[in-house]
Structure formats: C-alpha cells, structure tokens
C-alpha cells in the first residue's frame, strides 16, 4: 500500500506532506468504512447462525480485515510520521496481515461456492463450521507469522514510520501474493459462472435463484479485481523497472490514482455485502423502520432458528447466502 512502497530498498509514501484534501480523503474513507464494516460485523455476530450458514465465517473474516484497515491505516495515515518508532513494526504487521487476509478469504469464498456448485448434495458434509474455524485460525496465524518474518528485515531509516527500508527481494513475496490471490479468485469465479451457466438439469426458476445466490461472490470478486489488481500490478512492475518507473511522472500518477481507488474499494466492500446479501439488507431496513413487522421473519431471526435437521441430501438450495 501507500505506506509500504518499498522500491529500491527505500519506502516512501507518494505524498509525505499531505494536503487538506488528502487528509480529508483518508479520514472520511476511514470513518465511512468503519461504520459500515462495524454494522456488517454486528449483524453477522448477532443474527446469523454460523452452524446453519458456515460460509458466513468467511464473510466475517473479510469484514474484520477491512475494519482493522479502516481503523489502523486510514484513520491514522495523516499522522503516521508522528508515530513513536516502536509502533512502526506492529503497524506494518497489522496492515499487511489484514490486506492479505482479505484477499485470501476471497479465495476461500470462491472455493466454498465451487464446492457448492460441484457437490451440492454433499456440501454440508464437506463444509461445516468447525472446519471453517480451523481454516480461519490457520489463515490469520499463517499470514501473521509470515508478516512477522517480513518486518524483521524492516529498518527505520528516516526517523519515522514513513521512512523505512526493506530489501525488495524479501518484500517481493508480498505483491506477488496479492496478484496471485486476486487472479485466483477471478479465475475461480469465472469457472463457477461457466459451470452454473451450463447446468442443464435446472429449471429457469432454479437457475435464477442460483445466480442470485452467487451474486455476492461475483460482485465482491469483480470489485476486488478492478479496484485492487491495477495498483498491485503497477507496484509489482515498479520493483523490476526500478529507477525508470520512479522518475516517470505518468507512472507515478497512475500508481497514485489506483492506490486511491484501492482505498475506496476497501471502504465500499461492506456496502457490497449489505447490498448483495439479503439478510444484511433486510436487517438494515428493519433497523431504519422501513420493513413491516411481519415481513421476512424467518430471515431476520436466523439466530433463533435451529440448524436444519434434514440430511444434506434433502437440504434445498437457498438464495439468502
């Protein structure tokens, strides 16, 4: 990200002396992102039964990662140069881990849907809450350990957390990870779309429900692809082209522009979750009094409902995520 631009062993933000507009951009994105991510997280933890809907654990992980980014990075970026030096290493560990975790969980979400499409009768035998909790622990723990290892090579060179040095060959793993995860998610989504589109045994009504069920996945994957991948690719290429890219004003402007888009993308992620997933949307409408008392009771009271006692073979497809 902006705070981790490590090229030719030197990390330097795009703009060290932020203007009023840039400060307002970071703070406003941080506040809006915090509010919406906290709202999604509250709804998920309060009203969703993860025994019945284990895939929501993945959504919760993505939301937590984005929430931490909004709080730890966006709201503090204008004052990063004033941080105590002992905060620099934990700061980079947190923001790197959160970004990687968000990308990796998008891959898990695609894998989950691929299993659902390929093995619908055995989905709940393959995917369950316990397994996803183990995957969650392994994902966060593995990425945290990897970034702890990365920051051991980090050196503060300019007296603030804005000026740090890291061997580009060591840090190369990070941008490659982002690009590979995003392309993997996009490829899996394309595969899922092709499989769903070519299902011949489904009636039109069933097919429509299936695609509504997949809408959140496709929206999240495409949004990440267009808001995150351009910056990651430009950054990865800049490591190899070195001084040529650093002195090219057009390249720097494009990189700066796509970085801003990445920040906006993180802020909008929870909005996409609310917009595309029925349970979040209905609960939010209920909170603002726009839903009648007797509407969609089953969806709004998910937490009070037992997990289905029917075997997975007889569990129908649902389109409420």
Curated annotation (Swiss-Prot):
InterPro entries: Aex-2, GPCR_Rhodpsn, GPCR_Rhodpsn_7TM. Keywords: Cell membrane, Cell projection, Disulfide bond, G-protein coupled receptor, Glycoprotein, Membrane, Receptor, Transducer, Transmembrane, Transmembrane helix. GO terms for biological process: lipid transport involved in lipid storage; neuropeptide signaling pathway; positive regulation of defecation; positive regulation of intestinal lipid absorption; positive regulation of triglyceride transport; regulation of defecation. SUPFAM superfamilies: Family A G protein-coupled receptor-like. Expressed in the intestinal muscle, anal depressor, AVL and DVB GABAergic neurons, enteric muscles, the nerve ring, the ventral nerve cord and head mesodermal cells. One of its GO terms (molecular function) is neuropeptide receptor activity. The chain crosses the membrane at residues 25-45, 56-76, 91-111, 133-153, 176-196, 222-242, 255-275. Disruption phenotype: RNAi-mediated knockdown results in a mild defecation defect. Disulfide bonds join 88-161. Residues 1-24, 77-90, 154-175, 243-254 are extracellular. GO terms for cellular component: cilium; plasma membrane. Its main location: membrane. It is a multi-pass membrane protein. It comes from the Eukaryota. Glycans are attached at residues 2, 9, 17. It is found in: Cell membrane; Cell projection, Cilium. Pfam families: 7tm_1. Residues 46-55, 112-132, 197-221, 276-321 are cytoplasmic. CDD domains: 7tm_classA_rhodopsin-like. G-protein coupled receptor for the nlp-40 neuropeptide. The activity of this receptor is mediated by G proteins which activate adenylyl cyclase. Plays a role in the defecation motor program, which is a coordinated series of three muscle contractions that occurs every 45 seconds. Specifically, acts in GABAergic neurons, such as AVL and DVB, to control the expulsion step of defecation. Required for fatty acid uptake and metabolism by intestinal cells and therefore regulates the levels of triglycerides in the intestine. Belongs to the G-protein coupled receptor 1 family. This is G-protein coupled receptor aex-2. It comes from Caenorhabditis elegans.
